């Protein structure tokens, strides 16, 4: 792939005019050496390790941002799933651990900390259940702690007992946090990845080093402008434009990641290629799809356009870096994408269409606000549907859904900042309560048997 002089100028304009940024430098920290039978000692150990390993992260990001002229929007921490780390305490609540994570993250100045998590794709240990039941109070009493639950995988199937509990947990969190905001910090996964730098689903996987740097880039506005200014006629040419643009975006992220690793003396892990939108005008994944030829995101052809975008981003990014990982694709969070917001408000982008789109993009149903009266079993049904797509197709899928207490279809909710605002979207009539209450496990599909 040859690089022309005008493309170098385009790279400069990416930052100046097109909202390009490095969305996050995330340091993953292993907490296994913090384990103790005493929960107070565990909390002290966790605080000490996070504040020691992560103490220079924010300063390093600021130095690199000034040096290269590229905004680095967030600095974050991910930790080993707390359900594993706190198990030895035999405590009946892990809220104090969440509060320790919150204090430690604030002490070093990072934006978010992830890893208040449980991996329950095949079954729940007592510690896993304690953690999940602690999530509502943890989200209520902390500010920047993020939580995730992995309830299924292609190799294990879907743990429907965990799906039921996850729905109840989200509903409870919505009831006790203002406008359900706590739910914006909870993700339910199928096939969760261990090196995700993005929140709210980041955790530090069991196969990772003691500490590692993972970087997430963001450039929907860059891709849209490249398409708008190109002479691409066919979709083949559109894919080529996206691929070349993703290459340039990825090279910047790779540079930042490698430099951060040197300065912090922490190994560089992965670069996540995901196009992560913001509520800002000109920073929208939906608008990219519309630039390809759709009148509005959500109309017929949207899933195909998104598949093209996702694949071209991966191809361009893989050529630019040997460290591609995480989720790497295109995010479609409704409240964080002004184009998605507009399409949802018009009624054209629906929950059903979003579910179809998740079969071909990076993650899943993300930052979707639903009526506060939505029952827990409906939330569980939505999670199960999304998990089934991930399980059968061997990809990561997820649900981050916010039942907004006291609000109904036709209203909207304001989250602020990068989380934006969202119209309340309708859910289906009818009930899946009997199905969800059956529990058990949806067996792993035939394609899980690969050995």
Curated annotation (Swiss-Prot):
Q: Which InterPro entries match?
A: UPF0210
Q: Which Gene3D superfamilies match?
A: 3.20.70.20
Query: According to the lineage, what is the superkingdom?
Result: Bacteria
Assembly and oligomerization: Homodimer.
| Protein family (similarity comment) | Belongs to the UPF0210 family.
- What name does UniProt use for this protein? UPF0210 protein Asuc_1169
Q: Which organism is it from?
A: Actinobacillus succinogenes (strain ATCC 55618 / DSM 22257 / CCUG 43843 / 130Z)
